[in-house]
Each structure stands twice: as structure tokens, then as C-alpha cells.
């Protein structure tokens, strides 16, 4: 009997504490539900493409050939541009990277509706196969040649040989410059034979091998030609020794002088 009374007393003593815990748990649950609802509403609002579309473009970089209009045009080809939350940056970057003059594109989103684009352009080093351009690494790109400012050497070669031809021009042109000449065109044909056209119009046939020796042979011959060099059409150096010299016809030379 005493035990029963004691137990009942304990229950009576604890009941306010139990109620307090129950109220606290209920309040905490309500707060969680409110926070969850608010978070869900916020995320849904941020992902709603009608509310926060990426609609502004900021273009940065030292640019001479790429404009904001170029970037807008390639982005307009996408099915759609999402929101700050939903848009995949890689998709934007791949699209902008397709612009012919763009060497590298770095893109990030800025809250709430802005796309920031930083571009690095290719730097022209040479013309390639009459319809493309090369950068300093021998990378081929297809920028609009008509927009290129300045004079550049014309390089030609089979697919995949651009770095090799560019290196050859860099190696040999300084040697010609010592005689006051410059390489205007450098050609590596399909048979892997080399041809040089100088800025004074002389064409050099060098063949496939012994380029250093054949070019050195040309230098000796050119010094011997003196003033007669302007009468030379081509020099064929594809021999073990010596060279074959092709001369302009006398009539053609006379016509050129009259034109001057």
C-alpha cells in the first residue's frame, strides 16, 4: 500500500516536467517545419526560370577581335539559359570557347542574374594554308583573316605539321635577315619537300633533306650574285653541290622597270 502511494506521488511530481518537454518538442518541430517550408519556397523561387533568368553579360579581357555581340550570339544558340542556380557553367564555357578567336574562356555567375565572362584571345603569329591562322604555339585557329592587322608570314603544310613549319620559319628567318632578306612564304608540301619564297620574290627549292647546308649554299651564292639578284626568279638547291638558277625573261624585267 505504501509502495503504491509512493509511485503515485512520483507520477504526480513528474507530470509538469513531461508537459514542458512535450511543449518544447512541439515548438521545435514547428520551427523545423517553418524553416523547411521557407527553405523549400526560397529554393523553388531561385530555380524558377521566370523569376531569376541570367539576363546580364559582363565581358572582360584584353580583346581586339571578340565583342560582346559575338558572345551573345553563341549563347543565343543554346536551347535556353537557366537561372543562377540551374545553369551549368560548363555548357556556357563550351559555347563561348567555340568562338574562333577565343583561346580560353573563364565564366562565372554573379548573383542574381549576371554572367561574367573573361576571355583570352589567340595572338596571331602567322597565316596558315591561306584560310587559317597560327598562334605562337603553332595552334591552328580560324579567325577572320580579313580582320588581322599587320603583315604576317604565310606558312603552308599538311595537316598536323603547323608546329614544325612554324619552328622552321623561326629558325631560318633570322639567318636570312642578316642579308636584309625575309621569308615571305614557307611551304612544306605533301612530299615533305621545302620551298621558301623571299620578300624580294626569289623562290628557293630546298628538297627534303640537308636544309641547313642548302640554305648556307644559297647565302654564298646570293652574295656572289650582287645586283644580278633582282633578275633571279628561282634557285634550285636540290643538288649535292651547286645550284640551278632560273632567270626572269629580259622582256619581263624591262616591263617591271617601266612599271616602276
Curated annotation (Swiss-Prot):
Gene: ftsQ
Transmembrane regions: 27-47
Keywords: Cell cycle, Cell division, Cell inner membrane, Cell membrane, Membrane, Transmembrane, Transmembrane helix
InterPro entries given in the database record: Cell_div_FtsQ/DivIB_C, FtsQ, FtsQ_C_sf, POTRA, POTRA_FtsQ_type
UniProt key word Transport: no
Keyword tRNA-binding: no
Membrane topology field: Single-pass type II membrane protein
Residue intervals of the POTRA domain: 52-122
Homology family: Belongs to the FtsQ/DivIB family. FtsQ subfamily.
Name of the molecule in the record: Cell division protein FtsQ
Function: Essential cell division protein. May link together the upstream cell division proteins, which are predominantly cytoplasmic, with the downstream cell division proteins, which are predominantly periplasmic. May control correct divisome assembly.
Source species, domain of life: Bacteria
GO cellular component: cell division site; FtsQBL complex; plasma membrane
Residue ranges annotated as Periplasmic topological domain: 48-260
Subcellular location as annotated: Cell inner membrane
